[in-house]
């Protein structure tokens, strides 16, 4: 029941995805060949959320791996869990998108999309009751952004009532991987606003900061960053996979976190994060976790929650703890920091408790927040977009693939609208809410 199909698009998506499968397989006691080696019935009880059982009791991930060049696929296959995936679920082109959104969305990607949809439908048909799709991709490149958004809109057509959840790696402010990032990101956000139900925004720079500051790693690698992300991804779905006192699923998350349909871009955090050396000096308790969870340094985006206000938030606790204590702490946070929470949504933190903690921890918590400060990120990308678009820099790469300048203008204005919507709800007070209604009546 409640299966999730995981789609990984582009290099970034596949690398995060393969790390994620390592974490999930470890939690469920599945070894790299797909055989169950665990010691607890709880691991098997709902293993079918992410795994399909094949002949001979072998567990196969419900995963679709897409890329427009074969390179990443080879490194996934060569990785520790490379042999666990179904070979038919690797779908790749030969040419690569070359960091070009138009190639991923209109030319190269469009040629592959039918075979990708076939595999996705096969995976969906083997499910009892499909909960939704989870898509890992980056917005700065060509494949993850262009082809990823194309796939999302196609899946939306076929499965209109299923949850579409994306884990989107947003370009970071100081570190840029490609020059045309602002173009690719803006065009992607334009699609995500319309077609996804929940988008978790993650950015590399914030992840680097967490590794460097909190975990005290001197030279963090992409492997370390991806491990952080996969801890959160597994935390979001742990209620589906293990028994809990207070369950949540993707749909409950969406219902509780999205007050207005367009504002579905979330920040994520994870606690406890401590460096190896100082682990034994810290106690794990619900107050301690709550404190770290709301800490700005723990957020996986380069946006400061103190600059905005929380529309809604969700805390997914894992481990043995009293639900009473969880409720008290959540109430406590809201009362003490009431200025950072929107006052016209009372009780805006959803909490859930799952009994099984992650491997090697007694308790942990995953945090998902819908904060208006995420507009900083879109605003930053929008400014970079405008600077380049005003001079029409690099545009010929996109128009050459059949795109129109009009599309760029549309995407830009859609993203600017998103920013101003966030700003509007950040400034709104209870008194003003009444005025909005009155204006509509005349």
Swiss-Prot record:
Please tell me one Gene Ontology term that the record gives under cellular component. microtubule
Q: Does the keyword Endoplasmic reticulum apply?
A: no
Q: Which UniProt keywords apply?
A: Cytoplasm, Cytoskeleton, GTP-binding, Magnesium, Metal-binding, Microtubule, Nucleotide-binding
Main subcellular localization, coarse class?
Answer: cytoplasm
Q: Does the keyword Nucleotide-binding apply?
A: yes
**Requisite cofactors:** Mg(2+)
Q: Where does the source fall among the domains of life? A: Eukaryota
Residue positions binding Mg(2+): 69
What SUPFAM superfamilies is this protein classified in? Tubulin C-terminal domain-like, Tubulin nucleotide-binding domain-like
GO MF annotations in UniProt: GTP binding; GTPase activity; metal ion binding; structural constituent of cytoskeleton
Gene Ontology terms: biological process: microtubule-based process
Q: Where in the cell is it found?
A: Cytoplasm, Cytoskeleton
Residues annotated to bind GTP: 11, 69, 138, 142-144, 204, 226
SMART domains (alphabetical): Tubulin, Tubulin_C
**Gene3D superfamilies for the chain:** Helix hairpin bin (1.10.287.600), Tubulin/FtsZ, C-terminal domain (3.30.1330.20), Tubulin/FtsZ, GTPase domain (3.40.50.1440)
Give the family this protein belongs to, as stated in its UniProt record.
Belongs to the tubulin family.
Q: How does it assemble?
A: Dimer of alpha and beta chains. A typical microtubule is a hollow water-filled tube with an outer diameter of 25 nm and an inner diameter of 15 nM. Alpha-beta heterodimers associate head-to-tail to form protofilaments running lengthwise along the microtubule wall with the beta-tubulin subunit facing the microtubule plus end conferring a structural polarity. Microtubules usually have 13 protofilaments but different protofilament numbers can be found in some organisms and specialized cells.
Question: Function, please?
Answer: Tubulin is the major constituent of microtubules, a cylinder consisting of laterally associated linear protofilaments composed of alpha- and beta-tubulin heterodimers. Microtubules grow by the addition of GTP-tubulin dimers to the microtubule end, where a stabilizing cap forms. Below the cap, tubulin dimers are in GDP-bound state, owing to GTPase activity of alpha-tubulin.
Q: Which PANTHER family match?
A: TUBULIN (PTHR11588)
Name the UniProt record assigns to this protein = Tubulin beta chain
